[in-house]
């Protein structure tokens, strides 16, 4: 939890901030959705098949890093199916009655979206299993000797779950999703399309070079791209510059301390501390957390994922190590590796 709070303070966090509205930039159909080509095409097939049969689509699980479009795709699925959409999140469903209230208010073939589904209470999961498999809800009414079991028939529905940590899902829950789909980081060219589209929707004049400058610093994440685009728009408006070109975008993002690889001050502090204090590693995560005055969860869940994905650090059995990419990015020369000296077999050295 602490890691999520820390990450939410970062401009380049892929997580949605409380009160942040990005609906204006969201695509409204699969045709408008950029990137995730195989996932998008497969979803189109499943949607068409469900509509042709007049049935609820099979349950869908989206998993992958935050900010890649899981919520947007869930809404698009409902829109393309021509059915209602109801959204909630795992932590908001506290007791079985909360889930029952949601499920009993669904119309036939509606889409129920549960974000952060890995954070569902295990007791809630037990109630969800028969609802997903048989469209039935088994509840215990009352307490003690007066308690009785009640079975409620539910309309057929499609559950769309989203998680950033699929490894935390229980096997029984994961196995009940007939359509598991992974979302991956976006290519720069895909983000250029997203940024260009976003600038049009925001009424912002942006050159192709300006769009690429924003895209390449967006950490492969559309949500980050949209956030950076808005901040660049602010700087350009105050400076009275239009259209926004690469020079203005670069100046604005430098002011925001987001460098050319999408790294921010926290990322650079992590890399610099490893280089300056520990010679590039290997160093344990607990030692790093203490050196950075951060919690271990923050280091593992907030700082490291993107650095590992981009090849700046690697995990080894002995700890974290900087790669050649990291040393180059820091403008430093890695220390020469000193191979361990083995004593001569016939020498008197211990």
Swiss-Prot record:
General function of this protein: The RuvA-RuvB-RuvC complex processes Holliday junction (HJ) DNA during genetic recombination and DNA repair, while the RuvA-RuvB complex plays an important role in the rescue of blocked DNA replication forks via replication fork reversal (RFR). RuvA specifically binds to HJ cruciform DNA, conferring on it an open structure. The RuvB hexamer acts as an ATP-dependent pump, pulling dsDNA into and through the RuvAB complex. RuvB forms 2 homohexamers on either side of HJ DNA bound by 1 or 2 RuvA tetramers; 4 subunits per hexamer contact DNA at a time.
Domain notes: Has 3 domains, the large (RuvB-L) and small ATPase (RuvB-S) domains and the C-terminal head (RuvB-H) domain. The head domain binds DNA, while the ATPase domains jointly bind ATP, ADP or are empty depending on the state of the subunit in the translocation cycle. During a single DNA translocation step the structure of each domain remains the same, but their relative positions change.
InterPro entries found in the cross-reference section: AAA+_ATPase (IPR003593), AAA_lid_4 (IPR041445), DNA_helicase_Holl-junc_RuvB (IPR004605), P-loop_NTPase (IPR027417), RuvB-like_N (IPR008824), RuvB_C (IPR008823), WH-like_DNA-bd_sf (IPR036388), WH_DNA-bd_sf (IPR036390)
Chain positions recorded as DNA binding sites: 296, 315, 320
Annotated Mg(2+) binding sites: 71
Assigned protein family: Belongs to the RuvB family.
Entry keywords, A to Z: ATP-binding, Cytoplasm, DNA damage, DNA recombination, DNA repair, DNA-binding, Hydrolase, Nucleotide-binding
Any one of the GO CC terms: Holliday junction resolvase complex
Annotated ATP binding sites: 25-26, 67, 70-72, 133-135, 176, 186, 223
GO BP terms in the entry: DNA recombination; DNA repair
Protein location: Cytoplasm
Keyword Nucleotide-binding: yes
Protein name: Holliday junction branch migration complex subunit RuvB
Molecular-function GO terms, alphabetical: ATP binding; ATP hydrolysis activity; four-way junction DNA binding; four-way junction helicase activity
């Amino acid at each position: 939890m602490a890691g999520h709070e820390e990450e939410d303070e970062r401009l380049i966090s892929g997580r949605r901030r409380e009160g942040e509205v990005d609906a204006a930039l969201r695509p409204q159909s699969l045709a408008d959705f950029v990137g995730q080509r195989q996932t998008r095409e497969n979803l189109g097939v499943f949607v068409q098949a469900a509509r042709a049969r007049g049935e609820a689509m099979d349950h869908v699980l989206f998993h992958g890093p935050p900010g890649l479009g899981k919520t947007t795709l869930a809404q698009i699925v409902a829109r393309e199916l021509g059915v209602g959409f109801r959204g909630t999140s795992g932590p908001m469903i506290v007791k079985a009655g909360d889930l029952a209230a949601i499920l009993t208010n669904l119309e036939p073939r509606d889409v129920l979206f549960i974000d952060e589904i890995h954070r569902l209470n295990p007791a809630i999961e037990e109630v969800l299993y028969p609802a997903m498999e048989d469209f039935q809800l088994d509840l215990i009414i009352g307490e003690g000797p007066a308690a009785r079991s009640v079975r409620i028939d539910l309309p057929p529905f499609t559950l769309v779950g989203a998680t950033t940590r699929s490894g935390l899902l229980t096997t029984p829950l994961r196995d009940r999703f007939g359509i598991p789909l992974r979302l991956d980081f976006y290519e720069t060219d895909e983000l250029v399309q997203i940024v260009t589209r976003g600038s049009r929707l925001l009424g912002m004049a942006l050159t192709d070079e300006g769009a690429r400058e924003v895209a390449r610093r967006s950490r492969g994440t559309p949500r980050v791209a949209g956030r950076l685009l808005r901040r660049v728009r602010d700087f350009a408006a105050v400076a009275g510059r239009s259209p926004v070109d690469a020079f203005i975008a670069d100046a604005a993002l430098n002011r925001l301390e987001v460098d050319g690889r999408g790294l921010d001050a926290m990322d650079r502090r992590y890399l610099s501390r490893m280089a300056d204090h520990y010679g590039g590693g290997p160093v344990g995560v607990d030692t790093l957390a203490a050196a950075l005055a951060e919690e271990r969860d923050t280091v593992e869940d907030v700082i490291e994922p993107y650095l590992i994905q981009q090849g700046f650090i690697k995990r080894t059995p002995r700890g974290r190590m900087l790669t050649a990419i990291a040393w180059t990015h820091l403008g430093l020369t890695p220390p020469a590796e000193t191979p361990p000296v083995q004593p001569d077999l016939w020498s008197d050295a211990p």
